[in-house]
Amino acid sequence: MLSNPEIINALSQLGLTNYESKVYLSLVSEGICTAKDISNICGIPYGKVYEVINSLAAKGFINVLPTKPMKYKAIHPKELIK
């Protein structure tokens, strides 16, 4: 997982929390993941992951894929800049 402090800082300037930044970066680097995958990759408690995912989706940073189990995909960083 990417954990570059400069990237985390840049994402915080865009309004993301530390957990949101970690989840977004993990999805950018890993691709499509389940909540369990995200929890394992980021070290964020599984119960907290859903709160973070919902927040990122509301802010337009990720897409929620209607699969079983639900999967999540980051919006490409270039798309966010537009």
Q: Locations of the language-model features?
A:
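Short alpha-helical "packing" element that flanks the helix-turn-helix/winged-helix DNA-binding module
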Residues: E20-L27
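Key DNA-contact positions within bacterial/archaeal DNA-binding proteins
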Residues: S21, K36, G47
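Amphipathic alpha-helical scaffolds
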Residues: G43, V49-V52
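Alpha-helical DNA-recognition elements
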Residues: E51-K59
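Short acidic alpha-helix initiation/capping motifs at coil-to-helix transition points
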Residues: M1-S3
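Short capping segments at the starts of secondary-structure elements
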Residues: V28-T34
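Short, cationic-aromatic polyanion-contact patches
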Residues: P5, N9-E20, T34, F61-K82
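A short acidic, leucine-rich amphipathic alpha-helix
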Residues: D37-C42
